[in-house]
Amino acid sequence: MAGSKWETEETNQFAIENQKLEEEWRKKRRLEKKRKRKILEEEEKAEERNIDACRLYLMGNTPELKSCNSIDDYEILEKIEEGSYGIVYRGLDKSTNTLVALKKIKFDPNGIGFPITSLREIESLSSIRHDNIVELEKVVVGKDLKDVYLVMEFMEHDLKTLLDNMPEDFLQSEVKTLMLQLLAATAFMHHHWYLHRDLKPSNLLMNNTGEIKLADFGLARPVSEPKSSLTRLVVTLWYRAPELLLGAPSYGKEIDMWSIGCIFAEMITRTPLFSGKSELDQLYKIFNLLGYPTREEWPQYFLLPYANKIKHPTVPTHSKIRTSIPNLTGNAYDLLNRLLSLNPAKRISAKEALEHPYFYESPRPKDPKFFPTFPSKAKGESKEKNVFQSFRSASPKK
């Protein structure tokens, strides 16, 4: 009985301390956000000085991108989705009678000039062309100077919508095929010194021939070695690497690889691996599953700005991911573990991951033409979950 009382008191004390830490964290974050806004403004001003080439794209003076046409050359069919930086429509190219995606750029009513996120997307998609990166075909304009659309190839789905609505899990052979394509695109992007900085299921588009493509390059940017100081206001919280959450002043390609690890787990379970409510809560969810960092495993951890806000358990902790996702093979677990290494220096690269034994063991990756066909969310079909029933009965695509 005494032991039970002691445990209750210890639990209550731990909760009180955690609440205090959370309050301190929030206060510091408010101050940090003000500082970050200033840094972001300075970064955007610096980037504005280096976007002359991107402005040439809009003027039609770049051979890599077809010159600006009119939006009148396209028929807008229906809205697919709306985000912070744009509205995406399904459209029809009147000259070729082919479907396209039309992304209407959102202009800040209080801003001056072309949105920096859209300039980044145009510059990135014009510089890094790959079979598994969505293709930017044209930039078209309407009658108004702020009526600007990016014309992209049309993809029927995004991975998040599929994972939310599928009645059964992807087969392991299908997960491997999707992962290989994601890693191939990322390896190509990293080889050309670009970071995506917002990899997540909703930014992975998929068509009905088993192809997956990276999209939404609004936060993407070129990087260099040694790593330069970059804004930490990147990557959706649930897919954000621990070094970003801990306030690392600089970072590199490893942040994209962490996001891929989270996506890999989500492809298998159809549930986000770390669904934190705040940055501190996200860190605790990561450490509770993967174990708390040690000096041996991650020496630089204790030098990061917010590391001293983390309350460490009194006893050593270990990864619980194998019990959390029990059906993984040894090789699948090893790949996931290396993608989700707390220490970014030990995180596997996209090029290394492509050669991992996981992709060579049985079952082998499925031929994309044997992938099931899913209803396109562009037609509103994805809202009806019953249309996903018996989706594996689809015949191979020709």
UniProtKB/Swiss-Prot annotation:
Family (UniProt): Belongs to the protein kinase superfamily. Ser/Thr protein kinase family.
Enzyme class: transferase
Organism of derivation: Schizosaccharomyces pombe (strain 972 / ATCC 24843)
Reactions catalysed according to its record: L-seryl-[protein] + ATP = O-phospho-L-seryl-[protein] + ADP + H(+); L-threonyl-[protein] + ATP = O-phospho-L-threonyl-[protein] + ADP + H(+)
UniProt cross-references to SUPFAM superfamilies, sorted A to Z: Protein kinase-like (PK-like)
Molecular function (Gene Ontology), one example: protein serine/threonine kinase activity
Binding site for ATP: I80, E81, E82, G83, S84, Y85, G86, I87, V88, K103
Gene Ontology cellular-component terms listed: chromatin; cyclin-dependent protein kinase holoenzyme complex; nucleus
InterPro entries in the cross-refs: CDK, CDK11/PITSLRE_STKc, Kinase-like_dom_sf, Prot_kinase_dom, Ser/Thr_kinase_AS
Protein's name in the database: Serine/threonine-protein kinase ppk23
EC number: 2.7.11.1
Alphabetically ordered keywords of this record: ATP-binding, Kinase, Nucleotide-binding, Nucleus, Serine/threonine-protein kinase, Transferase
GO BP, one annotated term: signaling
Stretches the record annotates as Disordered: 359-398
Active-site feature positions: D198
Compartments, as annotated in UniProt: Nucleus
Residue ranges constituting the Protein kinase domain according to the UniProt record: 74-359
Superkingdom, natural source: Eukaryota
Residue stretches of biased makeup (Polar residues): 387-398
